[in-house]
Amino acid sequence: MSAAEGAVVFSEEKEALVLKSWAIMKKDSANLGLRFFLKIFEIAPSARQMFPFLRDSDVPLETNPKLKTHAVSVFVMTCEAAAQLRKAGKITVRETTLKRLGGTHLKYGVADGHFEVTRFALLETIKEALPADMWGPEMRNAWGEAYDQLVAAIKQEMKPAE
């Protein structure tokens, strides 16, 4: 999966699948981002406690403006990083953003299992967002690999401050 000097090898075929599907989903990213997070909380209700803005909130998740803002931001960043993966040969999220993401995920105790739940929720959200004839093993693998690359980049930054 990785080439010399840490460059990511993401095939043209996978890139084409990601770009084609992202073009369809991008128009509805606010709604899809929220659906993505609702799936995470459906699978792992305790994950709500990892988000300070949800801990003491009585606002239903579906209408929580802070969750909506966070959800679209995460969904768009994830999809844009996937779309740029082949061309850039690496995750294109700014280094400062990756450091912040790594620090935040470390602070809130995010573990491998959380990333797995998020991966499953992302793939299910994408599957539901696309026409049925577009979704299949190739599409699942393309998005799964792109997500795994993003997670690997975040995990690289999940180190306690020295």
Swiss-Prot record:
Seeds and roots. Its cofactor is heme b. It catalyses: Fe(III)-heme b-[protein] + nitric oxide + H2O = Fe(II)-heme b-[protein] + nitrite + 2 H(+). One of its GO terms (cellular component) is cytoplasm. Heme b binds at residues 66, 70, 100, 104-105. A motif (Homodimerization) lies at residues 42-46, 112-124. The keyword Lipoprotein does not apply. InterPro entries: Globin, Globin-like_sf, Globin/Proto, Leghaemoglobin-like, Leghaemoglobin_Fe_BS. Keywords: Cytoplasm, Heme, Iron, Metal-binding, Nucleus, Oxidoreductase. CDD domains: class1_nsHb-like (cd14784). It is found in: Cytoplasm; Nucleus. The record marks 140 as: Homodimerization. Pfam families: Globin (PF00042). The keyword Lipid biosynthesis does not apply. Its main location: cytoplasm. Binds 1 heme group per subunit. GO terms for molecular function: heme binding; metal ion binding; oxidoreductase activity; oxygen binding. Homodimer. Belongs to the plant globin family. Phytoglobin that reduces nitrite to nitric oxide (NO) under anoxic conditions (e.g. during flooding or in waterlogged soil). May not function as an oxygen storage or transport protein. Has an unusually high affinity for O(2) through an hexacoordinate heme iron because of a very low dissociation constant. This is Anaerobic nitrite reductase GLB1. It comes from Hordeum vulgare. The gene is HB.
